[in-house]
Amino acid sequence: HNGRAITPTRLTPDAVPFSMYFNLDKPLIGFWLLLVCPWIAPRFSWRVSLRATAMGLALAAIAALGGAMLLGMVAWAPKWPHQGTLWLLNNLLLVTLVEEALFRGYIQGGLSRKLKLLPYGQTVALVVASVLFGLAHAPAGWQWMLLAGLAGIGYGLAYRFGGLSAAIATHFGLNVLHLVFFTYPMLTP
């Protein structure tokens, strides 16, 4: 079993209890991909990556957080939980880096390389990676699957125009916005 880092806690009175584990098995996949497939992390200037991050984060936030509010999944709830620093480290290193290495770097990047001669190959690669990312969130319910797929489009655009670091920053940025400004993880049904 993975170690529990945060015991079930309500971050706001209207939220479902949140708990967090240090899932150390999943990161092995991401780190392995970074070592074995260096092509998943194309190089972009920091300015280009920063612009791609801003664009991707704006789109992902409007689609995913706006969609979550429309679906009644979250509400405005600004806060800084006392577990915030631990959450930040876990989310950056063991969640977003790993998920983006797999979904954007390996899947979207790999498909982009294979489909580069097709007129819409880059778009197909982005959509396929986003759909698969959404499906990976299916255990949380159709709403989170839909919202993750929409967020995945923002992450995919950041990857396409700014590389893996932009996709990681976009994903991490959206997760931080969710934690700090909205009900986390979701409203109690």
Report the location of each language-model feature.
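Transmembrane helix-loop-helix hairpins at the membrane interface
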Residues: A58-P189
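Juxtamembrane helix-loop-helix connectors linking adjacent transmembrane helices
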Residues: N2-V95, R113
